[in-house]
């Protein structure tokens, strides 16, 4: 899996924006990607040093549309902590 396939998009929420002050950046990642692949992808794309990676899995939720029932897509989110002295990613 290539670096551009691992990272899907950055997660921009109030909680993730507050975490940026602590050098923590949040990304939606491919559901098959592991911590090592996420670390390599962030270091390759943004040219920074990664300290650690935490991964959160979200299960699909049931949703109804009238009488029809379906599921949302499952997601995987990675919180990447950069080493001190690294450049800000989004600034």
Swiss-Prot record:
Keywords: Ribonucleoprotein, Ribosomal protein, RNA-binding, rRNA-binding. One of its GO terms (molecular function) is structural constituent of ribosome. Pfam families: Ribosomal_L23. One of the early assembly proteins it binds 23S rRNA. One of the proteins that surrounds the polypeptide exit tunnel on the outside of the ribosome. Forms the main docking site for trigger factor binding to the ribosome. Belongs to the universal ribosomal protein uL23 family. Part of the 50S ribosomal subunit. Contacts protein L29, and trigger factor when it is bound to the ribosome. This is Large ribosomal subunit protein uL23.
């Amino acid at each position: 899996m290539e670096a551009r396939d691992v990272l899907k998009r950055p997660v921009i929420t109030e909680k993730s924006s507050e975490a940026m002050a602590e050098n923590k950046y949040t990304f939606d990642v491919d559901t098959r990607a592991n911590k090592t692949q996420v670390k390599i992808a962030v270091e390759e794309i943004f040219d920074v040093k990664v300290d650690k990676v935490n991964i959160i899995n979200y299960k699909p939720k049931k949703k109804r549309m009238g009488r029809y029932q379906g599921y949302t897509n499952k997601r995987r989110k990675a919180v990447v902590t950069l080493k001190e002295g690294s450049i800000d990613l989004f600034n």
